[in-house]
């Protein structure tokens, strides 16, 4: 698992390979990831937008942004957690993702919360160090 803490908001990511949706013979590799967002602050916050920076093993970058996550803009009161799952397809057997959420505190202040970088590695992937 991967974790980041920004402004007392903790983001935990657990990626997993989706073998049943992947087809290596057709250069299709799919991962799921589970995210848990925990509000350790003393104010309510709402997740407004998301931004993802996705890089495959060839260095090809894809940037994804939009409102909320999975169609929601969840409100997290102090002590609350919010969990969701989503996925990411790549044309290569490995890659890396990171990003941020834009949050709005109950007083109207907006700030970004880091999504930690996490690796997407196919099972059985052999790495060579030169």
Swiss-Prot record:
Pfam families: DUF525
Gene designation: apaG
Name listed for the protein in its UniProt record: Protein ApaG
InterPro entries: ApaG-like (IPR050718), ApaG_domain (IPR007474), ApaG_sf (IPR036767), Uncharacterised_ApaG (IPR023065)
Record domain ApaG: where: 3-127
Biological source species: Sinorhizobium medicae (strain WSM419)
Matches recorded under Gene3D superfamilies: ApaG domain (2.60.40.1470)
